[in-house]
Amino acid sequence: MFPMLTGFISYGQQTIRAARYIGQSFIITLSHTNRLPITIHYPYEKSITSERFRGRIHFEFDKCIACEVCVRVCPIDLPLVDWRFEKDIKRKQLLNYSIDFGVCIFCGNCVEYCPTNCLSMTEEYELSTYDRHELNYNQIALSRLPISIMGDYTIQTIRNSPQSKIDEEKSWNSRTITDY
């Protein structure tokens, strides 16, 4: 009779322990019900990129002196710079500049080391195409500025963290105090 009684006691202890684990898990689940959803509806809601986000490269043709520093610092020798030497002005004349974003790793070395600041990173990250050859941007495509996410009224922008919403409210309140 004692083995049967000890079996019932151990079964009861295991049942209580299992109920306690289920209760703890349920409390953790309930604590997450007040959180905002992490998933966003991508085409209609977009995250605002950080200030130092490295997106598509913007190129200003008039500033470029064809020094090819961008090619030398690029880990994959990606930018293609075509130039010719003008004897009358004794300077290089830029003919063509192109970057293949299908190969680019967006490291930002070309932007950082450019002596004339003709290269800059934009917040544009939507570079998907059906043909990989369309990712080869020449100087005309590189000089186009991206459409700002903030200016598009059809897209709802989502901040990445709740702290940024608090900071935004603080900055809004401080602006209303200082602006008369």
UniProtKB/Swiss-Prot annotation:
Domain 4Fe-4S ferredoxin-type, chain residue ranges per copy: 55-84, 95-124
Cofactor list: [4Fe-4S] cluster
EC numbers on record: 7.1.1.-
GO CC terms in record: chloroplast thylakoid membrane
Manner of cofactor binding, per the entry note: Binds 2 [4Fe-4S] clusters per subunit.
Keyword Lipid metabolism listed: no
Domain of life from the UniProt record: Eukaryota
Gene Ontology biological-process annotations: photosynthesis, light reaction
Signal peptide, first to last residue: none
Residues annotated as binding [4Fe-4S] cluster 2: C74, C104, C107, C110
Binding site for [4Fe-4S] cluster 1: C64, C67, C70, C114
Membrane-related topology note: Peripheral membrane protein
Compartments in which it is found: Plastid, Chloroplast thylakoid membrane
InterPro entries cross-referenced by the UniProt entry: 4Fe4S_Fe-S-bd (IPR017896), 4Fe4S_Fe_S_CS (IPR017900), NADH_quinone_OxRdtase_chainI (IPR010226), NDHI (IPR004497)
Presence of the UniProt keyword Cell cycle in the record: no
Family statement: Belongs to the complex I 23 kDa subunit family.
Described function: NDH shuttles electrons from NAD(P)H:plastoquinone, via FMN and iron-sulfur (Fe-S) centers, to quinones in the photosynthetic chain and possibly in a chloroplast respiratory chain. The immediate electron acceptor for the enzyme in this species is believed to be plastoquinone. Couples the redox reaction to proton translocation, and thus conserves the redox energy in a proton gradient.
Oligomer and partners: NDH is composed of at least 16 different subunits, 5 of which are encoded in the nucleus.
Record's protein name: NAD(P)H-quinone oxidoreductase subunit I, chloroplastic
